[in-house]
Amino acid sequence: MAKTSMKVKQQRAPKFSTRAYTRCTICGRPHSVLRKYGICRICFRELAYKGQIPGVKKASW
């Protein structure tokens, strides 16, 4: 889990635009965030298995 201080820090506008980064809206994880959904791969996987993300289904080929 991300530190509360880092979550608050990320909400502020960055001094320089290149310092902005995405963070998972559920757990606050800064890496591997899917832009389309705004959540990290771990949270995405959990929600997809539960069927809570519309239009997402398990791939099989």
From Swiss-Prot:
Disulfide bonds: none annotated. GO terms for molecular function: rRNA binding; structural constituent of ribosome; zinc ion binding. One of its GO terms (cellular component) is small ribosomal subunit. Pfam families: Ribosomal_S14. Zn(2+) binds at residues 24, 27, 40, 43. Keywords: Metal-binding, Ribonucleoprotein, Ribosomal protein, RNA-binding, rRNA-binding, Zinc. Binds 16S rRNA, required for the assembly of 30S particles and may also be responsible for determining the conformation of the 16S rRNA at the A site. Belongs to the universal ribosomal protein uS14 family. Zinc-binding uS14 subfamily. This is Small ribosomal subunit protein uS14.
